From Swiss-Prot:
The lineage of its organism: Bacteria, Pseudomonadati, Pseudomonadota, Gammaproteobacteria, Pseudomonadales. Belongs to the methyltransferase superfamily. RsmJ family. One of its GO terms (molecular function) is rRNA (guanine-N2-)-methyltransferase activity. It catalyses: guanosine(1516) in 16S rRNA + S-adenosyl-L-methionine = N(2)-methylguanosine(1516) in 16S rRNA + S-adenosyl-L-homocysteine + H(+). The gene is rsmJ. Its main location: cytoplasm. Residues 239-252 have a biased composition (Basic and acidic residues). Residues 232-258 are annotated as: Disordered. This is Ribosomal RNA small subunit methyltransferase J. Its EC number is 2.1.1.242. GO terms for cellular component: cytoplasm. Specifically methylates the guanosine in position 1516 of 16S rRNA. Keywords: Cytoplasm, Methyltransferase, rRNA processing, S-adenosyl-L-methionine, Transferase. PANTHER family: RIBOSOMAL RNA SMALL SUBUNIT METHYLTRANSFERASE J. It is an enzyme of class 2 (transferase).
Length: 258
C-alpha cells in the first residue's frame, strides 16, 4: 500500500464530468492520477468540491450560496443588525463599497452582498478561488440568489500586491479576515479549517496586509479576529465590536455618509 502524500489530484465523480475534470486539471496545473494524493478536487453534479482523502477525513468542502448555511443566514441572520454589518458601516441609506481582501469561501462577502453592498473579493489560493468561482457561477442561475452574487466580483492573486497596484476608484471599506495561527485543537473542529490549513497555511503577512489596506481604503478598514486574539501588529484600531467567538477591529479614516 502506497503511503499518502501531500499532493492534490483532480477527479470526475462520474464519467460525464471527465471533460470538465480535465479542463480544471489543466487550468490548476494538477494531475488526474495520483494514488498518494492527500486531497482530491472533485467535479460532479454539485459542481466543484475539495475532498480530503484518508480514513479520518471530514466531508467535502464546496461553495453553495443557494442552499444550506448561506441560505439560512440570508433569511434568518439578523439583517442590518448583524455585527459584521455594523462593523463595515451599514446603516440607513449607507451601503459601502467593500473589498474583501481575504475572501476564502465567500461567506462574509455574501452576507454583505445580500445586505446590498457592492463587493470585490480577492482570494490568493488558486484552489479556494476555483471553489468560489464555481459557487458564484452556479448561484447566478438562481432566481433569488442571482441578483445578490451579481454584486460580487472575484479577483485572484496576492491581495497585498493587488491593493498596492490598485487602479481606479478605491474601495470605501476593506475587510480582512486573516487565517489566525491555531493554538489548540478546537480551532480544527470545522471541516473547512481542517481542509484549509494544509492548503493555505496561516497569514503570517497580516501586518503587511493591514498596511496595504489602510493605504488604499477611502473610509475604513475592518479586521475580523478570534475574540481573544491580539490585534495585528501596526496601528491600533479605534474601537472593536466583540461577539461570542469573534471580534471586529475597526480602523476608521473618514465617516461614511448616506
Amino acid at each position: 500500500m502506497e503511503e499518502q502524500g501531500t499532493g492534490i489530484r483532480v477527479e470526475a465523480m462520474t464519467a460525464e464530468y471527465a471533460q470538465q475534470a480535465r479542463a480544471w486539471a489543466e487550468r490548476l496545473g494538477l494531475p488526474l492520477q495520483d494514488d498518494t494524493a492527500a486531497f482530491a478536487v472533485q467535479v460532479g453534479v454539485d459542481g466543484l468540491q475539495i475532498q480530503q482523502l484518508g480514513p479520518q477525513a471530514p466531508g467535502p468542502v464546496r461553495v453553495d450560496f443557494v442552499e444550506g448555511q448561506a441560505a439560512h443566514r440570508r433569511q434568518f441572520g439578523g439583517g442590518n443588525g448583524q455585527m459584521i454589518a455594523k462593523a463595515v458601516g451599514i446603516a440607513q441609506g449607507i451601503r459601502p463599497q467593500v473589498l474583501d481582501a481575504t475572501a476564502g469561501l465567500g461567506k462574509d462577502a455574501f452576507v454583505l452582498a445580500s445586505l446590498g453592498c457592492q463587493m470585490t473579493l480577492i482570494e490568493r489560493q488558486p484552489l479556494i478561488a476555483a471553489l468560489l468561482e464555481d459557487g458564484l457561477a452556479r448561484a447566478r442561475a438562481d432566481e433569488e440568489v442571482g441578483p445578490i452574487v451579481g454584486r460580487m466580483r472575484l479577483l485572484t492573486g496576492n491581495a497585498i500586491e493587488r491593493m498596492r497596484a490598485w487602479e481606479g476608484e478605491a474601495p470605501q471599506v476593506i475587510y480582512l479576515d486573516p487565517m489566525f495561527p491555531h493554538r489548540d485543537k478546537s480551532a480544527l473542529v470545522k471541516k473547512e479549517m481542517r481542509v484549509f490549513r494544509p492548503l493555505v497555511g496561516d497569514d503570517l503577512d497580516a501586518p503587511a496586509l493591514l498596511e496595504a489596506a489602510l493605504a488604499l481604503a477611502s473610509h475604513r478598514v475592518v479586521v475580523k479576529r478570534p475574540r481573544k486574539a491580539p490585534i495585528i501588529d501596526g496601528p491600533k484600531p479605534s474601537h472593536s465590536l466583540e461577539g461570542k467567538s469573534s471580534r471586529y477591529d475597526i480602523y476608521p479614516k473618514k465617516a461614511l455618509k448616506a
